[in-house]
């Protein structure tokens, strides 16, 4: 499982994303989380988390996309607790 999370993050780091692009999470209990500054997503700071309320996701503006959709968009929305 760690390897899958690592690969997901590695994909983010080595990929050049635009707001229209997306990446996949590989575990059914994972969602994707981005930390955003302003309106610009930072794919290198995105990672797959086991739950959208994971502490890592609590900073800045984020978007979560469940595994059931198969994709995690780089669009940013404000975090609402």
Swiss-Prot record:
It comes from the Eukaryota. The record marks 80 as: Interaction with carboxypeptidase. GO terms for molecular function: peptidase inhibitor activity. Disulfide bonds join 25-48, 32-76, 33-57, 36-72. Residues 1-15 form the signal peptide. The keyword Acyltransferase does not apply. Tightly binding, competitive inhibitor of different types of pancreatic-like carboxypeptidases. Inhibits human CPA4. Belongs to the protease inhibitor I46 family. This is Metallocarboxypeptidase inhibitor. The lineage of its organism: Eukaryota, Metazoa, Spiralia, Lophotrochozoa, Annelida.
